[in-house]
Design a protein with these regions (language model features):
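N-terminal Rossmann-like NAD(P)+-binding domain of SDR-like oxidoreductases, especially those catalyzing
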Residues: 1-104
């Protein structure tokens, strides 16, 4: 079984991906994240380092708005399930840059 998790370095995506990876080693988990700097890049890197300890986890640095890259990923893995946790964080930022939220 192949599962795509978007936003895998965010709080919810990380915890979900880590739980799945540890609970069933037969599942192949593909995680994507754009690793934007809205909040701590170091925190995201720590989470990614933790996820990479799981042999059934693979990471791609992809923004969900990069349609062609996503299309290639879908063709490569033919996912059974997609869990979409990618989102632009921060309510206040939405007042300054609403386009970032619309595109996401």
């Amino acid at each position: 079984m192949k599962i795509l998790i978007t936003g895998c370095c965010g709080f919810i995506g990380f915890n979900f991906a880590n739980f799945l990876a540890k609970s069933n080693k037969k599942i192949r988990i593909i995680g994507i994240d754009n690793l934007n700097d809205y909040y701590s890049i170091n925190l995201k890197r720590k989470r990614l380092k933790e996820l990479n300890k799981n042999k059934n986890f693979i990471f791609y640095k992809i923004d969900i708005n990069q349609y062609e890259k996503l299309k290639k990923l879908y063709k490569k893995y033919l996912f059974n399930y997609v869990f979409h946790f990618a989102a632009q964080a921060g309510v206040r930022y939405s007042l300054i840059n609403p386009k970032a939220y619309i595109e996401n």
